Amino acid sequence: MGILDTIRNPQDLNDLSEEQLEQLASEIREFLITNVSQTGGHLGPNLGVVELTLAVHRIFDSPRDSIVFDTGHQSYVHKLLTGRQDFSTLRQQGGLSGYPSRAESEHDIVESSHASSSLSWADGISRARQLTGEGDRHVVAVVGDGALTGGMAWEAINNIAADKKRRVVIVVNDNGRSYAPTVGGFADYLASLRPTIDSFRAAPAYEVALDWWKKKLQNGGPAGQFTYKSLHAMKKGVKDWWAPQGMFEDLGMKYIGPVDGHNLQALEHALATARNYHGPVIVHAMTEKGHGYAPARAHEADQFHAVGIIDPETGEPTGTAGAKSWTSVFADEIAAIADERKDVVGITGAMLIPVGLHKFAAKHPDRVIDVGIAEQHALTSAAGMAFGGLHPVVAVYATFLNRAFDQLLMDVALHKAGVTIVLDRAGVTGPDGASHHGMWDMSMVQIVPGLHLAAPRDASRLREELREAVAINDAPTVVRFSKGSVGAEIEALERLSDGVDVLARRPAGSTANDVLIVSVGAMSELALDVANRLGAQGISTTVVDPRWVLPVRRSIVALASHHRLVICIEDGVRAGGVGSRIRQEMRAAGVDTALNEVGLPVEFLDHGTRSEVLERVGLTAQQITHDVVAQVLGTKVPFARPLPGQQHPTTGSLPIL
């Protein structure tokens, strides 16, 4: 039995010797490599925080002391130390979440995996502790240097630093990266701290001497206090000359570090000093992403930030290569567009490769801007670029557009800026769970005046609609696509005058008009499956892909007026979604055809594969067909209306599907 097998809670760490702790760190790394290579997950970040997490749990008393992980993908070690060692179904339906989860443990606090929010959580928790008479309880926020490129982190620091008595410990996990190397002025500032003062200021002798002289002089009456203030000012001046690290202390926060993030003794000493300091403290820990695993360290792109199933010995992906991904199709096309148009620029929020701007950047490095984890800034900066005669393409995961809605509405749309926003990982994404599903975007952008929204169904339509988007220079455009592999090409029977594609009429050649199916983006394959099933039950269908779902095309409304029932199949939330908008346009035009929105419920959906999540919420061909048959037979609302010369059925039985 290894040492890891004996750990059930953080208190089990307290009696371990230095040698045992080193052995435990080795066992944890071996465990992570073995298990995450079988399930996929965030391997590199967790290999980099093994000693740091051990030290945090040995010095602080969780859950009495609150530990908050920014983004949370580096919480695997924390899970192991808090009694969760069944990683066999990590990120799978019914298994452990890839992020902190309150449902799993009292040691978990923040479940959202959106970056830069941990310090605001720490600020709020510490205020609550202070106001409820529990100000002696610590709040520890573990935040990466990448997350400190986000403005929200600095809003929190501004508030934390204002109160010198709250026990907030900010542990900066500085590995010089988020996905890729961290960029920007603050990244340069942190880099300036690394080689100069090293671990000198975190050494025990330094702190002991400092505390001894401080007490001696402050207890020496007015002369001693004057001498202390003079020497303290001199010390600060020398520090600022020796290394430009005065920013945190200028804000009124004690700074400890840099500390070797893989040296347990140094980490524990630094954290104990922070714990015993009755005020806000920054502990600056230098770590290495992928530490202890050669394949991760050698991986230039992101040091195994997130992996699929891999060979644990080599780090190479197992199995055969899959079909081309949506992201790779976008990457090729935007690079081609950039070759043709010098006014097109790319903007990424610290995710150059994941969002597919790397090929563009390789060809035109001066025209791709990495703004850090700063989506709000990205959108407003894009508006400024548009004003200056450029056409910015902001590529971001769909879930992260949530963070920049005000900027989209008030800076981009209000000023009719020609900005294209490309949303990767739209819809249900699967194993990363509630905070990563890109299911909110279509409802959000419905209320943005003048915005154009495209949802391509296949690779050809993605290329086509991306080019159409960057041709619009007087309004914002959004192009959204799913995670993973692109499906087969779906050719249209015809394209209507306003750009709507008719994909199928079932039965073929039918002139009957029972059900109009409006498919949004990648749901077209599902829509065609439903049409075939309905056709087998004698119900005629017309399947259309609007391509551009906003503004609603007139032909959609016209087709709706000639059908008994409209269903809109989308992989966003039903509330305020595409179907809802189509209904509004139908009613405004006096079309009273019943419409059924088939989409996602307004719920936070747990992790699982995409197909598992869709089945869980009823977005399957079988369930949709069952519901539509019931609506056509008049046994379920909304009832399909009778067309002229038809009578509404009053009875009927559902077939077995």
Swiss-Prot record:
Record keywords, A-Z: Isoprene biosynthesis, Magnesium, Metal-binding, Thiamine biosynthesis, Thiamine pyrophosphate, Transferase
Name of the protein this chain belongs to: 1-deoxy-D-xylulose-5-phosphate synthase
Binding of thiamine diphosphate, residues: 73, 113-115, 146-147, 175, 293, 375
Assembly mode: Homodimer.
GO molecular function annotation: 1-deoxy-D-xylulose-5-phosphate synthase activity; magnesium ion binding; thiamine pyrophosphate binding
EC number in record: 2.2.1.7
Gene: dxs
InterPro entries: Dxylulose-5-P_synthase, THDP-binding, Transketo_C/PFOR_II, Transketolase-like_Pyr-bd, Transketolase_BS, Transketolase_C, Transketolase_CS
Organism: Pseudarthrobacter chlorophenolicus (strain ATCC 700700 / DSM 12829 / CIP 107037 / JCM 12360 / KCTC 9906 / NCIMB 13794 / A6)
Pfam family, one: Transketolase_C
This protein's record includes keyword Transferase: yes
GO annotation (BP), single: thiamine biosynthetic process
Entry similarity comment: Belongs to the transketolase family. DXPS subfamily.
Gene Ontology CC entries for this record: cytosol
Obligatory cofactor(s): Mg(2+); thiamine diphosphate
Catalytic activity: D-glyceraldehyde 3-phosphate + pyruvate + H(+) = 1-deoxy-D-xylulose 5-phosphate + CO2
Known function: Catalyzes the acyloin condensation reaction between C atoms 2 and 3 of pyruvate and glyceraldehyde 3-phosphate to yield 1-deoxy-D-xylulose-5-phosphate (DXP).
Co-factor note (free text): Binds 1 Mg(2+) ion per subunit. Binds 1 thiamine pyrophosphate per subunit.
Enzyme class: transferase
Annotated pathway: Metabolic intermediate biosynthesis; 1-deoxy-D-xylulose 5-phosphate biosynthesis; 1-deoxy-D-xylulose 5-phosphate from D-glyceraldehyde 3-phosphate and pyruvate: step 1/1
Binding site residues for Mg(2+): 145, 175
